[in-house]
Amino acid sequence: CACLVGSEMCIRDRDVADHEYVWMVDYVYDHFDAFKLIACCSTGTRYEHYLDALIEIEVNASHLLMEKMQREGLNVLPLDDDMVHILASALFNGLFETVRHDTPKEKAVAYVDTLRTFYSAGWFKILGIQ
C-alpha cells in the first residue's frame, strides 16, 4: 500500500491491502486443483489468459491508487503503463509460483507476505514517497 504515512486513510488502505493478500492466498489454496490446472495446463483453453486478466485488474487498480495519491496531495513520480504491468505481472507470477511448485499453504502464506513487504517498500521507493 502506498499512501499518506501516518494518516487514518493510510492505515485503512494498508489494512485492506494486507487483507487482500491473505484473501488471495486463501482463495487460491481453497481451490488449489483448479489453480494448478490454470497455472500449468490451461494453454489452448478458455483459461489460458486467466493470469493475464488478473494482472490487468491489478494494473488498473494500481493506476487508480496512484491517481488517488495525487489527489490526496502526494507528489508521486510517474510510471508508464509498461512498468506498472511488469510489476503487477511479477507479483501475480510470484503467487502462481507457489501453485506451480506445490508449495504447502503455510509456506505460501509466508512467501506472499514477503512479496507484500517487498512490493510495498518497492512502490514507495519508485514512486518517490518517503
Residue spans for each PLM region:
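Single conserved hydrophobic/aromatic residue that forms the stacking wall/gate
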Residues: C1-G6, C10-I11
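Amphipathic alpha-helical packing segments from all-alpha helical-bundle domains
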Residues: D15, H19-D33, T45-R71, D82-S89
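C-terminal peripheral helix-coil segments that are non-catalytic and often amphipathic
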Residues: D30, N60-K68, V84-Q130
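Short, hydrophobic secondary-structure boundary micro-motifs
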Residues: K36-I38
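Short, charged amphipathic alpha-helical segments flanked by flexible coils
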Residues: N75
